[in-house]
């Protein structure tokens, strides 16, 4: 019994040093039909499984052009308790043992179309540590056309 308590104590200490962070749901779809695919919305469900606060400092996606990759920084809409909080810039905090539904709006201001293909690299910076998550987008690829008119 004592060894079990010691193990739990070690887990608690490890949790404080290295927060556990999961992306449990990851979907994407194109929104804003007036812009003809110049805007993309990514919807993710973030879960902080740790016993400490975490701060997400950076979220970006990379288009799949190997020659000229482009990092896109989003506008963030965080939904808590059914209320949307609009936040034009990161970072945002997550309390221990909580989850957030997050909408990320990406707009393409490049001089060319960007192809967001099957494999999407989603890059987080959490508590000054970088986490890169590769996820498959559902069923189809789409283009983010340039936003300038």
Over which residues does each language-model region extend?
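Hydrophobic residues on conserved beta-strands that form the core of alpha/beta folds
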Residues: 23-25, 41, 56
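Short, solvent-exposed loop/turn segments enriched in Ser/Thr/Gly
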Residues: 36-43, 117-118
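Short, acidic/polar linear motifs in exposed loop/turn regions
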Residues: 47-52, 110
């Amino acid at each position: 019994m004592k060894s079990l308590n010691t193990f739990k104590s070690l887990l608690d200490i490890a949790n404080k040093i290295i927060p556990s962070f999961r992306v449990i749901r990851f979907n994407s779809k194109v929104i804003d039909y007036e812009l003809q695919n110049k805007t993309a919305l990514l919807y993710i469900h973030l879960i902080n499984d740790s016993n400490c606060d975490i701060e997400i400092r950076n979220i970006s996606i990379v288009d799949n052009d190997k020659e000229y990759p482009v990092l896109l920084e989003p506008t963030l809409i965080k939904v808590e308790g059914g209320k949307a909080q609009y936040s034009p810039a990161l970072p945002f905090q997550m309390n221990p043992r909580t989850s957030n539904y997050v909408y990320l709006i990406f707009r393409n201001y490049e001089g060319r179309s960007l192809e967001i293909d099957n494999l999407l690299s989603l890059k987080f910076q959490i508590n000054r540590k970088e986490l890169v998550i590769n996820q498959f987008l559902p069923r189809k690829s789409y283009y983010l056309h340039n936003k300038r008119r």
